[in-house]
Amino acid sequence: MPTMWPLWLLASLLALSQALPFEQKGFWDFTLDDGLPMLNDEEASGADTTSGIPDLDSLTPTFSAMCPFGCHCHLRVVQCSDLGLKAVPKEISPDTTLLDLQNNEISELRKDDFKGLQHLYALVLVNNKISKIHEKAFSPLRKLQKLYISKNHLVEIPPNLPSSLVELRIHDNRIRKVPKGVFSGLRNMNCIEMGGNPLENSGFQPGAFDGLKLNYLRISEAKLTGIPKDLPETLNELHLDHNKIQAIELEDLLRYSKLYRLGLGHNQIRMIENGSLSFLPTLRELHLDNNKLSRVPAGLPDLKLLQVVYLHTNNITKVGVNDFCPVGFGVKRAYYNGISLFNNPVPYWEVQPATFRCVTDRLAIQFGNYKK
């Protein structure tokens, strides 16, 4: 029998999620299990911690007699998870701010399923069997900011998403195409998680992300063979790990000059063209682990804010004295606090100590035994 989360905890987590909207913990930690921690500082995540935050008074206890059978209702939170529901329940209080319907058997969202829920802030539909959504199903949800609809059977991104939406998590579905206009009017959106879908590069129509000002985008565990070139240029975080990307060409990153974090681990990257990384002047963290690189990528010393580089589990055989640090002092604005090189065929005893002259501490350098 699944453990039921206390309702006071759900309400608390809803309130806490405002400070760091992209870092999932506890109840919100549904799916991100690849081991890459989210940026946890406001500047790095690009998160706006003031806009869209509901008044804390809205979480004042209410005593509405409306509560669906079998559900738990308190503090404007309606929890109906793990009940084997076949449809969205009726008799949901109109002042509900969080509706939890995860881990059920819901296969369809109908036109009036959310009628009257104009105060709903977060809707959790993770791990159902949803394959059909009426084009007006979300119309009543004028204040919805968080929609979690991952681990369902969707073959397309739902139409007519609420214009108030800030965060969409739709990973682990069956989506193959992202058509132009599907995100039209979503000016408040800053986070989309759509990994775990069978998306190829050809599945993104030109202009698919037009109008979006995203800070965070994850398209991991898909079928990408290259870095998409038409993503929002406002991105601070881009995660494309666990794909089939083979190379980074000169202009692949041209649009993404505002990136703080770039995740490209677990791909098939053999080549990074010289100058490719020069378009990322604000980059702080770079994940290139579990690829097929034979050398340290060129251009790392020119990234003045870069602090973390994951290069473990590649085919790197040599590390040069100037591969990480610029020549001379005072050029780099932030020292490295993490460089991983373990599981590479590098004779670590041949690496000169001066190679890591711009690292905060020797413990930040991770070498390890290489096993062929």
From Swiss-Prot:
Pfam families with a match to the protein in the record: LRR_8, LRRNT
Keywords: Disulfide bond, Extracellular matrix, Glycoprotein, Leucine-rich repeat, Proteoglycan, Repeat, Secreted, Signal
PROSITE patterns listed in its UniProt record: LRR
Main location: secreted
Domain of life: Eukaryota
Propeptide stretch(es), residue numbers: 20-40
LRR repeat windows: 86-106, 107-130, 131-154, 155-175, 176-199, 200-224, 225-245, 246-269, 270-293, 294-316, 317-346, 347-372
Signal peptide: 1-19
Covalent S-S links between cysteines: C67-C73, C71-C80, C325-C358
Location of the protein in the cell: Secreted, Extracellular space, Extracellular matrix
Post-translational modification: The two attached glycosaminoglycan chains can be either chondroitin sulfate or dermatan sulfate.
Positions annotated as glycosylated: S45, S51, N274, N315
A GO-annotated cellular component: extracellular space
Coiled coil, from the record: none
The family this protein is said to belong to: Belongs to the small leucine-rich proteoglycan (SLRP) family. SLRP class I subfamily.
Subunit structure: Homodimer. Forms a ternary complex with MFAP2 and ELN.
Biological function: May be involved in collagen fiber assembly.
Protein name as annotated: Biglycan
Native species: Equus caballus (Horse)
Native organism taxonomy: Eukaryota, Metazoa, Chordata, Craniata, Vertebrata
Encoding gene per record: BGN
